[in-house]
Each structure stands twice: as structure tokens, then as C-alpha cells.
Amino acid sequence: MDHLPIFCQLRDRDCLIVGGGDVAERKARLLLDAGARLTVNALAFIPQFTAWADAGMLTLVEGPFDESLLDTCWLAIAATDDDALNQRVSEAAEARRIFCNVVDAPKAASFIMPSIIDRSPLMVAVSSGGTSPVLARLLREKLESLLPLHLGQVAKYAGQLRGRVKQQFATMGERRRFWEKLFVNDRLAQSLANNDQKAITETTEQLINEPLDHRGEVVLVGAGPGDAGLLTLKGLQQIQQADVVVYDRLVSDDIMNLVRRDADRVFVGKRAGYHCVPQEEINQILLREAQKGKRVVRLKGGDPFIFGRGGEELETLCNAGIPFSVVPGITAASGCSAYSGIPLTHRDYAQSVRLITGHLKTGGELDWENLAAEKQTLVFYMGLNQAATIQQKLIEHGMPGEMPVAIVENGTAVTQRVIDGTLTQLGELAQQMNSPSLIIIGRVVGLRDKLNWFSNH
């Protein structure tokens, strides 16, 4: 280990930055956030330093570097574009046994600045020892995505509860299980973020008073249309906290690779007209796992509330008194159209968009007359097997046969295929495609040749 990671208490302690440019400004922000009593020395300063000085946040010393500025300092940073001056600052600090950071010169410094994830009071520092700052930054960005933004507020609140929790729970094991519940409770985190005192109190009392082996909870998470990069930040956090993940075939392998390694995985894949696991059985799986006290994620392709039967699953949980929440996802219509260069709305061509299921419950019938109207975009989910019927019905109700159409297969994935044509060709085009596919009908499809960015990558 080349460096010892430490966290310094700098509040109301003298610190010095030598340099008045953009790099020095970034370092100054960190020291000011830490509460340091800051002096900045340079021949000239960018406007931000002047603004800080006018606000009484720091002291500016304009002119050449004077070693006496270090006499009362706890810590110094050399952040000029003059290597010789930076070296001089470092040597003067070393002689006084003051830790000094030299920007972009780790060998000349007695300490280095890590990449920081600030969820105060929780702090995470990432460093490559100065050998690869870009790698440290990339790792920090990945860690940022794993730590909820409100985690710091939850940590502060936990500090206020420590005394009560110690009284309530007799053993270390009980206290540990309580804290684990508290830190993954979304309602508490959101209530703290909103400063909703009533909800904070209610949630806290519920967490403290319910048995530690209480029923679990279910989170419906939309996995998006295929590309793992389209999974939301909150969705990622949820699947990495899950004890059980119940997923279907529309969830890509790339997304499943993000699931916590020790989580149980239950595949309930479904296809139009064929259910690997009946919907009622899926409902019971969610209920059964939650009643075991587990944190269950129901992971669905697209958005769980858009043709995902999420509402049906939640009704079962609601009737059984199981807590649940929903994390929306990017629905297939949005993802597939964007990755195909087809805007769903356009001032010249479509003032509305309709999302339509391609198969209905027995006896269901669509309002084809309204669907055949101009100035709108139609998006059919699970409509591949009904493409010929869709073509026939729309033409019968007045939609022009030359209306542009497109079918998107495996939308947003690297295996995405798009085929386009006219409404009179829809049934024939569908025979060339496989599920999962999405059908888009409307004048906006005509923009695809111009706006198709994804295939060019």
C-alpha cells in the first residue's frame, strides 16, 4: 500500500492554495465544503475567487508566493501551471512538516487527492495512487450509480436513532437486521429527502415495532427495452439489493449480469399466446417469496405498467397486505422508436401517439375508426401475429394503404433489426420478423432514413 487513506478534519483550520486558475478553483471548492479556513495566493485570480472573497468565504493574497503563508497551515495545495513554483511550494511545506498536494505531480506531493463520492456523512474515496486518474474517475462514476442520492440523509437520521435502537433491540444481531431494513427502505429515504416529518415518523415507528422476521416486500422494476445502459439508476440499485429476482424473457442477459450474485433467480418467461408460467402462478411466486421476509424484485422488460401486467401482480400483493413499490422503465415504444430514428410525435406529422396491445382478452375489439385517423402515430405491442389483421382493419376504416410502417425486432439491442414499408405490405413484412417486435405506423416513419443514427454506429 503506497498511500494511507485518511479523512482529515479541516473545519476552521488554516489551509493554503497557491494558484488562481480553474484547477485551483476545483480544489478550493473541496476545501470550502470541508469547512477549511482558506487562503489563496496567486498573481491573478479568476472571477470565482473574487466572488468567494467578497462573500467572506476565503482570503486572497495577490502577489508572488511567500513561504510565510505556510506558517499556520495544516495543509497546502500547489495548483499553478508553473512546475518550478509548485516544487518550491512542496519543498517549503515539507520543511514545515505540512502535507502538500501538487496537482498533476504525485511524486512531488506528500498526499494525493482521491476521487470523492459525497453522501455526507458517508464518504467514499477512490484513488489509483496518481497512476491513472481517469480509471479512478470511471470507478467513482460506477460507485456513484450504486449509492442512492439520499443515502447521506438516511445515514444522518440513523445516527439520531442509535440510542433508541439500542434500547429496543437487545442483541447485536437484532440491531444489525434492523439497520439493514432501515437502509434499504425507499419510503424512509424519500420522506427524508422531502422533509416529510409525518411520513418519517410513521415509517420509523413501523420499522422499529414490526417483528424482524416480518413479511418482505416486492419492487416492480422496469428493465427497459433491451440495452442494459437504458436501465434506470434506481432500477440498478433495486436489483442489486434483491434477495429474489423474478424475471421474464424480455430482460436481457446483460441486465441479469447486474443482479446481485447471491440473489435467487426465478425465470417466468412469457411469449404471446404461450405462457411458460401462468400469470396467476407468477402472482403466487411473488406473494410466497415476500411472505418469507425476502426483498423481491419483479423485473420486467420495458415499463411494468405498460402492457406488463404489473397492475394485476400488485393487486394480488395489495390484497395480501404485502408492501410494494414500482420503479418505472423506458417502455419499448420509446426505446425502439428512438433507436430506429422514428420520432413518435412531430409537429408536422403526429400530434398524438397511441400505445396498443396486439392481442386482447377474448372478445376484445379495438376502435379501428379512431385508430385510422391522420396526424397520429400507432405503436402495436405484441402485434406480430396480428399484423395482417391490423393491416386489413386499418385500411377498411380509411387509413391510406401507402401509410409508412416499420417493424422493430429486438429494439435497442445490438441485434436490433428494422424493416419498413407501407401499410399494404404490413402482413408480408411481419413474416420476415421474429418476436419480440414492435409495429410503428404513421407518417413519422418516413423520417427514419434521415434520423436513423443507431444502425450507423
Swiss-Prot record:
InterPro entries: 4pyrrol_Mease, 4pyrrol_Methylase_sf, 4pyrrole_Mease_sub1, 4pyrrole_Mease_sub2, CobA/CysG_C, NAD(P)-bd_dom_sf, Siro_Cobalamin_biosynth, Sirohaem_synt_dimer_dom_sf. NAD(+) binds at residues 22-23, 43-44. Residues 216-448 are annotated as: Uroporphyrinogen-III C-methyltransferase. Gene3D superfamilies: Cobalt-precorrin-4 Transmethylase, Domain 1, Methyltransferase, Cobalt-precorrin-4 Transmethylase, Domain 2, NAD(P)-binding Rossmann-like Domain, Sirohaem synthase, dimerisation domain, Siroheme synthase, domain 2. Changing residue 309 to L: It abolishes methyltransferase activity, but has dehydrogenase and ferrochelatase activities. It is able to bind AdoMet. The keyword S-adenosyl-L-methionine applies. Keywords: Cobalamin biosynthesis, Lyase, Methyltransferase, Multifunctional enzyme, NAD, Oxidoreductase, Phosphoprotein, Porphyrin biosynthesis, S-adenosyl-L-methionine, Transferase. Changing residue 227 to A: It has all activities of CysG. It holds the Pfam family CysG_dimeriser. S-adenosyl-L-methionine binds at residues 225, 301-303, 306, 331-332, 382, 411. Pathway: Cofactor biosynthesis; adenosylcobalamin biosynthesis; precorrin-2 from uroporphyrinogen III: step 1/1; Cofactor biosynthesis; adenosylcobalamin biosynthesis; sirohydrochlorin from precorrin-2: step 1/1; Porphyrin-containing compound metabolism; siroheme biosynthesis; precorrin-2 from uroporphyrinogen III: step 1/1; Porphyrin-containing compound metabolism; siroheme biosynthesis; siroheme from sirohydrochlorin: step 1/1. The modification Phosphoserine is found at residue 128. GO terms for biological process: cobalamin biosynthetic process; methylation; response to osmotic stress; siroheme biosynthetic process. Its EC number is 2.1.1.107, 1.3.1.76, 4.99.1.4. In the N-terminal section; belongs to the precorrin-2 dehydrogenase / sirohydrochlorin ferrochelatase family. Then it catalyzes the NAD-dependent ring dehydrogenation of precorrin-2 to yield sirohydrochlorin. Finally, it catalyzes the ferrochelation of sirohydrochlorin to yield siroheme. PANTHER family: SIROHEME SYNTHASE, SIROHEME SYNTHASE-RELATED. NCBIfam families: cobA_cysG_Cterm (TIGR01469), cysG_Nterm (TIGR01470), PRK06136.1 (NF004790), PRK10637.1 (NF007922). This is Siroheme synthase. It comes from Escherichia coli (strain K12).
